[in-house]
């Protein structure tokens, strides 16, 4: 019956595909793979490009693209049920490089972690989508004490030989020749002269080695560490003779750093038919408050200087020229909604560590995901890489204990912080729904029953939780929770919050549950305009999208409209909060691409007399179903800023615009303020809150008793609202310290006491 209803809905909305398409535009914004994509590799095979990298505890993925900008997950080369996988944050799979050699697809990777780590493996397949073989351990050639884990493959097309580039400690760089069976032949090129000891080593770890050829030269590039410099050397002969290689001792990244300001760990460079060259690098966000999104995947163009060495511009904070490549309709790489209508789980979903295949199924109950704990818990996850979205699920769960949970969560890579909403049992033994993060928890009794809708909304670091009996009328649980510690950089120990990136998904604890669907970005929940996935011309201000002029646009990826049995919603109108001090303009709403996609509505924005005076504007639209990348194209006349946008959403029949109006008038802090740190006195770390009635450039400095600057814990633009920072004092002496803030014309100083 479910299939029949889906078929009817498909024909009803035939003109709007369930999975929309995006074309390649002339420009793009990094990251092209938001969220964790560390140690990336890149391979061109035919008309396709493939990338993979370190996944650590989550199951690894292979991504495919035709244009280097839009990527899709096509396979998992290592199964979560592989007995050697382990279950250790920061363990699991290190590196990962898929290549095509001798008519076979090979995926080489390292097994990291404290237990069972430091070993290289490969798996094989007849096609990149799999199925992939059980991994085979790579044998260590005589004379080498190990192969390391952060490695890659180089195929010399001129000789037909292929090599494993190994890194097993600071000084141990080698090129290991491989045979047709994927195992070392015994021929090893020794590059230990590259980064000789003892410490300090000239190039740090000299890790993540990659190679490529260009105009007859071999290029060997390596990273200083997981962030930092990127170095390169070249030779016209593939040899381990030091005298044959010329090393560039400076960072090959140059220019002005942007939002992602410490890129390195580049992939092998690929050259296109138009002779342009490209690589994928990784980098943290420049704002340490977003470090825990991980080392994100950045597409960078490579040029060569007069001496023939590669040069890469730091990725700017603005759009850049895209490769001249055709798009195949792949949407932007953000987490994918899933109605669980297939018989096998999509490769978009990863597990955490070793997970028995008996703990999940899409066939126990048609159209639902069955998930049971493996040990204490179980989860399916995707990258958490954006700043605003709304997660929705419908869960069928019969908890019998306060330790039983089933719901949605966002977690950090070290698996120590969890923002979650879930079905459970309260201390009185009654069914309940809870929303929590760290020590803050809100709970209400569940009067709906075993099947309940849950929604978790992220608006930057603020989380909010909701529940519903029908997926239409939602009730918030408690208040918003500031989850900054989920996202912020934290030094080791205890968390090392930046090494592995945040994840989001579904989870169970203590007992099995059924999940009917997973929605990533709900069309009917506020979509914050300042956080587009891709954009042209416009810019992001503290609380709004600004700099809007004629022919500018902004894209919001992976918007789920439903229109199916699982989520039977259909929009009838479009609502937007905007302001204009000019004659205004028009917002065109396109699905999947501009001009070649489908325009579903036009919304006229008239003057509101002031850019600070926001009003609600609406327009009718045709029905839409499925998941789409939504583009807002802006048109108008004149050179002045046409308008500003705070948020938008789509409305169903009978929906009220009230929620949008409420947001427009939402109370922001009325004054600047700096709160007393908590706890005070403190040991190791303390929280410092401050409020901003408007977006401002903030400087928050720690001083010692002599008034000398110790460190800055905030320097940069912050949006209006309440903000929370963490101050870590592990390296300081006990005593009295002061902290002061400057924001706009406001300044204030407070005292705190640190006791080791």
Residue ranges: model-predicted function:
Residues 21-569, 573-588, 592-596, 611-620, ...:
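Carbohydrate-active catalytic/glycan-binding domains of CAZyme proteins
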Residues 1-22, 661:
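Bacterial Sec-dependent N-terminal signal peptides
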Residues 663-756:
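C-terminal outer-membrane/trafficking sorting elements
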Residues 610-617, 720-726:
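Aromatic sugar-binding surface patches on proteins
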């Amino acid at each position: 019956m479910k299939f029949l209803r889906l078929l009817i809905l498909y024909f009803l909305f035939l003109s709007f595909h369930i999975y929309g398409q995006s074309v390649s535009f002339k420009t793009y914004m990094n990251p092209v793979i938001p969220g964790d994509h560390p140690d990336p590799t890149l391979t061109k095979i035919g008309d396709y490009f493939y990338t993979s990298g370190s996944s650590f505890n989550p199951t690894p993925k292979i991504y495919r693209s035709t244009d280097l900008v839009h990527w899709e997950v096509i396979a998992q080369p290592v199964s979560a049920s592989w007995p050697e996988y382990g279950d250790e944050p920061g363990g699991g799979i290190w590196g990962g490089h898929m290549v095509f050699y001798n008519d076979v697809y090979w995926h080489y990777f390292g097994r990291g972690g404290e237990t069972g780590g430091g070993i290289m493996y490969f798996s094989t397949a007849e096609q990149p989508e799999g199925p992939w073989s059980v991994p085979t351990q790579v044998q260590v050639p005589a004379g080498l004490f190990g192969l390391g884990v952060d490695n890659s493959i180089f195929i010399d097309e001129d000789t037909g030989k292929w090599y494993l580039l190994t890194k097993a400690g600071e000084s141990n760089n080698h090129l290991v020749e491989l045979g047709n069976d994927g195992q070392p032949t015994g021929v090893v090129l020794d590059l230990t002269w590259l980064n000789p000891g003892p410490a300090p080593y000239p190039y740090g770890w000299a890790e993540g080695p990659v190679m490529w050829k260009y105009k007859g030269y071999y290029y060997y590039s390596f990273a200083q560490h997981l962030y930092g410099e990127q170095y390169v050397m070249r030779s016209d002969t593939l040899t381990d003779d030091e005298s044959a290689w010329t090393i560039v001792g400076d960072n090959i990244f140059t220019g002005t750093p942007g939002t992602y300001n410490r890129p390195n760990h580049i992939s092998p460079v690929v050259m296109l038919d138009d002779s342009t060259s490209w690589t994928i690098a990784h980098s943290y966000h420049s704002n340490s408050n977003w470090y825990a999104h991980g080392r994100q995947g950045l597409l960078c163009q490579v040029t060569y200087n007069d001496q023939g060495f590669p040069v890469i511009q730091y990725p700017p904070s603005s759009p850049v020229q895209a490769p001249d490549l055709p798009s195949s309709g792949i949407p932007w790489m953000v987490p994918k909604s899933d109605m669980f209508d297939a018989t096998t789980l999509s490769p978009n979903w990863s597990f955490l560590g070793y997970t028995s295949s008996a703990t999940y199924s899409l066939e126990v109950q048609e159209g639902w995901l069955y998930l049971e704990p493996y040990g204490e818990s179980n989860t399916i996850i995707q990258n958490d890489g954006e700043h605003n979205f709304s997660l929705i699920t419908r869960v069928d769960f019969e908890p019998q204990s306060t330790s039983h949970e089933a719901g949605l969560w966002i977690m950090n890579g070290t698996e120590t912080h969890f923002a979650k909403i879930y079905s459970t049992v309260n201390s009185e033994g009654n069914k309940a729904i809870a929303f929590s993060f760290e020590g803050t928890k809100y709970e209400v009794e569940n009067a709906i029953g075993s099947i309940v809708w849950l929604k978790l909304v992220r608006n930057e670091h603020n989380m909010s939780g909701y529940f519903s009996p029908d997926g239409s009328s939602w009730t918030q649980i408690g208040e918003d929770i500031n989850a900054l510690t989920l996202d912020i950089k934290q030094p080791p120990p205890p968390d090392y919050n930046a090494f592995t990136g945040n994840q989001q998904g579904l989870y169970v604890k203590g007992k099995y549950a059924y999940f009917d669907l997973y929605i990533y970005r709900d069309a009917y929940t506020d979509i914050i305009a300042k956080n587009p996935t891709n954009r042209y011309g416009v810019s992001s201000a503290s609380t709004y999208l600004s700099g809007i002029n004629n022919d500018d646009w902004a894209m919001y990826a992976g918007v789920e409209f439903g229109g199916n049995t699982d989520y039977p919603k259909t929009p009838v109108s479009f609502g937007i909060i905007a302001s204009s001090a000019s004659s205004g303009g028009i917002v065109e709403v396109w699905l999947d691409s501009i001009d070649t996609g489908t325009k579903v509505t036009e919304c006229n924005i008239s003057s509101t007399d002031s850019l600070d005076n926001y009003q609600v504007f609406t327009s009718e639209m045709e029905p839409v179903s499925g998941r789409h990348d939504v583009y807002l194209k802006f048109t108008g006349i004149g050179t002045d800023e046409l308008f500003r946008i705070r948020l938008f959403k789509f409305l169903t029949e009978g929906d009220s615009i009230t929620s949008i109006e409420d947001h427009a008038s939402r109370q922001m802090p009325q004054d600047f303020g700096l709160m007393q740190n908590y706890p005070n006195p403190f040991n190791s770390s303390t929280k410092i809150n401050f409020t901003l009635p408007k977006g401002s450039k903030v400087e928050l400095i720690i001083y010692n008793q002599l008034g000398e600057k110790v460190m800055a814990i905030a320097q940069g633009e912050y949006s209006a609202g309440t903000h929370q920072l963490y101050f870590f004092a592990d390296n300081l002496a006990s005593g009295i310290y002061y902290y002061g803030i400057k924001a706009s014309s406001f300044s204030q100083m407070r005292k705190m006491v640190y006791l080791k």
